[in-house]
From Swiss-Prot:
Residues 6-110 form the SSB domain. Residues 145-155 have a biased composition (Basic residues). This is Plasmid-derived single-stranded DNA-binding protein. It comes from the Bacteria. May contribute to the conjugative processing of DNA. It has a functional relationship with Psi (plasmid-mediated sos inhibition) proteins. GO terms for biological process: DNA replication. Residues 117-179 are annotated as: Disordered. The keyword DNA-binding applies. Residues 55-61 bind DNA. Homotetramer. Residues 167-179 have a biased composition (Acidic residues). InterPro entries: NA-bd_OB-fold, Primosome_PriB/ssb, ssDNA-bd.
Length: 179
């Protein structure tokens, strides 16, 4: 299948209400979010600050939907990556349309700022992706000829050491400006 374009939406906004989570017949979770993005500017004629808010319908699927229902609350700031999709339906003989941002397994949701008064939420800046995270692979020790060693050769997964930033605030740079 040839790709004839890119359909990618990135939003950073605040939730206008708590997520609405429901489960479809196959057991998968679906969450609906109302995300507001705002733009402000100074009116050239009056000098007043103006603001325009756009509301976006965001639909999350699977584990992302479950996490959204558990962790997100009205007022939380979120980062969303998804796809734009328009769907239609008939309502008393009138064709209705709605455009939504779909966040499927290839999408991302990241909570940036907690809502005021929210309680059981993850750390700020925690990112959730629709793709399953790889499980640590168990290392199997083998003898010559491929036979497994005693105890099946399984080792406990060890966390990888994180690189440490350089000491001090200079990050290896001098304070001299080169011009």
């Amino acid at each position: 299948m040839a790709v004839r374009g890119i359909n990618k939406v990135i939003l950073v906004g605040r939730l206008g209400k708590d997520p609405e989570v429901r489960y479809i017949p196959n057991g998968g979770a679906v969450a609906n979010l109302q995300v507001a993005t705002s733009e402000s500017w100074r009116d050239k004629q009056t000098g007043e600050m103006r603001e325009q808010t756009e509301w976006h319908r965001v639909v999350l699927f699977g584990k992302l939907a479950e996490v959204a229902g558990e962790c997100l609350r009205k007022g939380a700031q979120v980062y969303i990556e998804g796809q734009l999709r328009t769907r239609s339906w008939e309502d008393n003989g009138i064709t209705r349309y709605v455009t939504e941002i779909l966040v499927k397994t290839t999408g991302t949701m990241q909570m940036l700022v907690r809502a005021a008064g929210a309680q059981t939420q993850p750390e700020e800046g925690q990112q959730f992706s629709g793709q399953p995270q790889p499980e640590p692979q168990a290392e199997a020790g083998t003898k010559k000829g491929g036979a497994k060693t005693k105890g099946r050769g399984r080792k406990a997964a060890q966390p990888e050491p994180q690189p440490q930033p350089p000491e001090g605030d200079d990050y290896g740079f001098s304070d001299d400006i080169p011009f």
